[in-house]
Swiss-Prot record:
This is Glucans biosynthesis protein G. Involved in the biosynthesis of osmoregulated periplasmic glucans (OPGs). GO terms for molecular function: carbohydrate binding; catalytic activity. The gene is opgG. It comes from Cereibacter sphaeroides (strain ATCC 17023 / DSM 158 / JCM 6121 / CCUG 31486 / LMG 2827 / NBRC 12203 / NCIMB 8253 / ATH 2.4.1.). GO terms for cellular component: outer membrane-bounded periplasmic space. Residues 1-38 form the signal peptide. Its main location: periplasm. The keyword rRNA-binding does not apply. PANTHER family: GLUCANS BIOSYNTHESIS PROTEIN, GLUCANS BIOSYNTHESIS PROTEIN D.
Length: 540
């Protein structure tokens, strides 16, 4: 396995997305300098947690009831920061590091360590952390003594100053080596968080909830305002934490069970209470970046063949059928909807896993994790929505995917959702008898070397492996294709000699400005032999 990308500045560029006013303006340019990096085990014990005035007993049900009551009261925005916290700018924030010798839980037998992110700059809403030990809550307080202030900040910031909270936190764990506490999961900004499987580098993010994303209604960014972290004992390999979520339209009580490994699992339970009606509820939202790949790199003068954190949306349907929708960087805002009932999973995947696919020795896109959302319990009917936002820069997250439950959300409603997030280099060969979509390419239609007078677009889809990959070129198989708002002019299917790949080539025509929806799979001998390829082409 290749060594994980160093958790350097590059890996943190989009932990800050919540600072944008809308997910349709996700420009976090210049944020690559934030100090998230693997940490060595601290040498000194951290200060003891400061207890609240009267330590109280904690349970998930207690937090749930508190958030239910909060939903009956008006939403209150956090107050603006004052003093030096309110004056911090980008360069200042880059000059602040958490002191590793102040890591919380370092003086316990826990396998996990807590480190905080500093308040200020884009992060003006204080987050409170609480330690839950033997069922009782103690607030974990932070001061300027917990942070290193470099450059001219060292003269501006006084020592021993209590902070009103933190911006978020990271949980470290010996993920890749037993002697190094690597960053495992980070919560920073609104309800954003991200995690790593073994050998991964940061890429895709998740959120606690998406409210009115890419709708005519104002978008909200719910935020986690408090976290309650159960202290694992005796070398326990799972961390359990709880979060209070607040927003103008909704409150929530969340439970996270985080289990690190080759694939890091996060089991999420979200109990939601609505102050007001919501135009669109986005459950288990994922946020990623797709700039270009082989199918659209002609407009980029770049030595790298691919630049993306994820290259496709995968949906495993209730009946086991797998949909694969390659991602786009469209000319205008695009949405795709996949109606489902109790899907087995959906997620944003990074299927290309070779350095040669990217040739980026700094970003190491081949190490970015895939993430699957696996519903737990009955989710009923709804749809997976994919939103693709035009961008010119890889520093912008422009891909959003989430579940939209069927039905209206009204004031006074309550909902509960449970699901599992799988983070890692997820396998693509399951089930092994089904060919998966190996590559999607696109270009001018017609015959090579001849002018394309018909103005068609050519799509080349490679299906690899499975039973299909073992069939000879004269096997009785066929491509089942469909198109909306366009026309398939020509269609060919052939086996590539010496490879377990079958290639489908489509020439598609459409009117100017049309949004064309394409679908294809391979079938034969009375059964489906491949995943279903889906694609949206906007003829600009």
């Amino acid at each position: 396995m290749p060594a994980p990308a160093a958790p350097s500045a590059r890996l943190n560029r989009r932990l800050l997305l919540s600072a944008a006013s809308s997910s349709l303006a996700l420009a976090a340019s210049g944020l690559m300098g934030l100090p998230l990096r693997a940490q060595e085990a601290p040498a000194d014990a951290p200060p003891a947690s400061v207890p609240v005035a009267a330590p109280q007993q904690f349970s998930y049900d207690w937090l749930t009831e508190e958030m239910r009551v909060a939903a009956t009261q008006p939403h209150v925005e956090p107050e603006n920061l004052t003093g030096f916290l309110g004056e911090l700018q980008y360069d200042d924030y880059r000059s602040i590091n958490f002191r590793t010798d102040r890591s919380r839980w370092a003086d316990t037998d826990s396998m996990f360590r807590i480190q905080a992110f500093h308040l200020g700059w884009l992060f003006g809403a204080p987050v409170r952390l609480y330690d839950v030990t033997d069922g009782y809550v103690h607030e974990v307080r932070f001061s300027t003594d917990d942070f290193e202030y470099r450059n001219e900040l060292s003269t501006r910031v006084a020592a021993h100053v209590d902070l009103p909270g933190v911006a978020g936190f990271r949980l470290n764990f010996p993920l890749n080596r037993p002697d190094v506490f690597d960053e495992l999961v980070a919560f920073l900004g609104a309800s954003y968080f991200r995690a790593l499987g073994r050998g991964n580098g940061y890429g895709i993010s998740a959120r606690g909830l998406a409210v009115n994303t890419a709708t005519s209604a104002p978008e909200e960014f719910p935020r986690f305002s408090r976290f309650y972290l159960e202290r694992p004992h005796g070398g326990g390999l799972s961390a359990v934490l709880y979060a209070a979520m607040e927003s103008p339209s909704v409150t929530g009580a969340y439970r996270f069970v985080i289990t690190p490994g080759i694939e890091t699992m996060i089991e999420v339970t979200a109990r939601l209470f609505f102050r007001s009606a919501v135009t669109q509820l986005g459950v288990a939202p994922l946020t990623s970046m797709f700039l270009f790949s082989e199918k659209n790199r002609a407009t980029y003068d770049d030595f790298r063949p691919n630049v993306h954190d994820s290259d496709g949306l995968a949906v495993r349907r209730r009946d086991g059928d797998i949909l694969w929708r390659p991602l786009n960087n469209p000319p205008r805002l695009a949405s795709s909807y996949f109606g489902e009932e109790n899907p087995q999973a959906f997620g944003l995947h990074q299927r290309k896993r070779s350095f040669d696919d990217y040739q980026d020795a700094e970003a190491h896109y081949e190490l970015r994790p895939s993430v699957d959302v696996e519903p737990i319990g009955d989710w009923g009917k709804g749809m997976v929505r994919l939103v693709e936002i035009p961008t010119r820069y890889e520093t912008n997250d422009n891909i959003v995917a989430f579940w939209v439950p069927e039905g209206q959300i009204s004031a006074g409603d309550a909902r509960e959702f449970a699901y599992r997030l799988r983070w890692g280099a997820l396998p693509i060969e399951e089930p092994s008898d089904i060919a998966h979509i190996w590559e999607t390419r696109a270009g001018h239609g017609g015959v090579s070397g001849v002018e394309n007078t018909g103005e068609t677009r050519k799509f080349v889809i490679d299906f690899k492996g499975g039973l299909l990959g073992g069939l000879p070129g004269d096997a009785e198989v066929e491509a089942i294709t469909s198109v909306q708002h366009g026309q398939i002019v020509t269609q060919t299917l052939e086996r590539l000699d010496g490879m377990d790949i079958w290639r489908l080539v489509l020439d598609v025509a459409a009117a100017e400005g049309a949004t064309v929806e394409l679908a294809a799979h391979i079938a034969g001998y009375g059964r489906k032999l491949s995943e279903t390829w889906l694609y949206q082409w906007m003829k600009a």
